[in-house]
């Protein structure tokens, strides 16, 4: 078994909506990013890549490459997952924690789980997504941005 951890942050800027966990969420602010700014899928992709010792999302999809300008993070996740499977790994489970004072994530979590399970080709029981606030402390609490942490467990596929 191998475990990976991912973390991502994006500052608010411009106008919404935002995309979190592949879900378009109405919000008055947007997120500043080279791609679509999906902190949940970026953290998850990093966790998966880390568990497989394949570096990180910035190495695989550099923000200096114009090809990834405005990229759909679901596509990035699927490409990373293909590379991980090519190394002979299967998924144990993933757990994602979104850290945001606003907007509220709870109504969107079921669809996030559906999208992640689809992208990883796994059962929804292998995908957990939750959200928390920082009780108005720090940059997320002040409404300056959104953060996310994720962990992923991989196993070598049986031969």
UniProtKB/Swiss-Prot annotation:
Enzyme class: lyase
Cofactor annotation remark: Binds 1 divalent metal cation per subunit.
InterPro entries, sorted: MECDP_synthase, MECDP_synthase_CS, MECDP_synthase_sf
GO molecular function, one term: metal ion binding
Cofactor(s) the protein requires to work: a divalent metal cation
UniProt function note: Involved in the biosynthesis of isopentenyl diphosphate (IPP) and dimethylallyl diphosphate (DMAPP), two major building blocks of isoprenoid compounds. Catalyzes the conversion of 4-diphosphocytidyl-2-C-methyl-D-erythritol 2-phosphate (CDP-ME2P) to 2-C-methyl-D-erythritol 2,4-cyclodiphosphate (ME-CPP) with a corresponding release of cytidine 5-monophosphate (CMP).
Protein's name according to its UniProt entry: 2-C-methyl-D-erythritol 2,4-cyclodiphosphate synthase
Organism expressing this protein natively: Salmonella dublin (strain CT_02021853)
């Amino acid at each position: 078994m191998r475990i990976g951890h991912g973390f991502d942050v994006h500052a608010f800027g411009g106008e919404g909506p935002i995309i979190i966990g592949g879900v378009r969420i109405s919000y008055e602010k947007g997120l500043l990013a080279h791609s679509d700014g999906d902190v949940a899928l970026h953290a998850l992709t990093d966790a998966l890549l880390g568990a497989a010792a394949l570096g990180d999302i910035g190495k695989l999809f550099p923000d200096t490459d114009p090809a990834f300008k405005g990229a759909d993070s679901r596509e990035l996740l699927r490409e990373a997952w293909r590379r991980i499977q090519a190394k002979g790994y299967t998924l144990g489970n993933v757990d994602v924690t979104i850290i945001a004072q606003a907007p509220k994530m709870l109504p969107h979590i079921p669809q996030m789980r559906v999208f992640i399970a689809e992208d990883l080709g796994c059962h929804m029981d292998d995908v957990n997504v939750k959200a928390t606030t920082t009780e108005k402390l720090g940059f997320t609490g002040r409404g300056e941005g959104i953060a996310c942490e994720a962990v992923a467990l991989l196993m070598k596929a049986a031969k």
